[in-house]
Amino acid sequence: MGITSAMVKELRTKTGAGMMDCKEALTSSNGDFEKAIDYLRKKGMSAATKRSSKAAKEGTIASYIHMGGRIGVMVELNCETDFVAKTEDFKNTAKDIAMHVAASNPTYVNPDEIPEEALEREKEIYRSQALAEKKPEKIWDKIIEGKLNKYYEEVCLTKQKFIKNTDITIETLINNLIAKTGENVIIRRFARYQLGEELKK
């Protein structure tokens, strides 16, 4: 497919990579944005990749209270400098993420935090399902990969669709902020509380 300047601009906005790098990535991936982003990451061309080695020790802790005080969230969002931490873009992003956590109830920040035993348990379930559905064994790995990606979207904050703009994920939201600020930005941790959730009826 033809690669348009609008596509290149959109990829550049999402990743912070150079225009020529974005065009190369889109050409290589035949216009597939997710594959183009992966291409840039593998090449170390995205702003997120370049900034990831920088220490992010400044930042803010944002809070959000929802549903008449029945759900509360705190999110720690980190960056490299106090200057960026005080910007409205940074503070608003932290607040938006806290609001998202309240609504979407993720379990982990990203897939790296999922315990290995939990992943193996999920994979075993998917294998059993594939066997029960009499799927050819040669496509099991592909089926498991697809189901794992769906699982990540359910339990991992960074893989979820952003509630205020479902065209992007939380990961893309962070990458956009990295591109805009020129600093490494990471979601360090979050906590979500729901009134009475630990009480037995």
Curated annotation (Swiss-Prot):
Keywords: Cytoplasm, Elongation factor, Protein biosynthesis. The keyword Repeat does not apply. Pfam families: EF_TS. Transmembrane segments: none annotated. Coiled coil: none annotated. One of its GO terms (cellular component) is cytoplasm. This is Elongation factor Ts. The lineage of its organism: Bacteria, Pseudomonadati, Thermodesulfobacteriota, Syntrophia, Syntrophales. The gene is tsf.
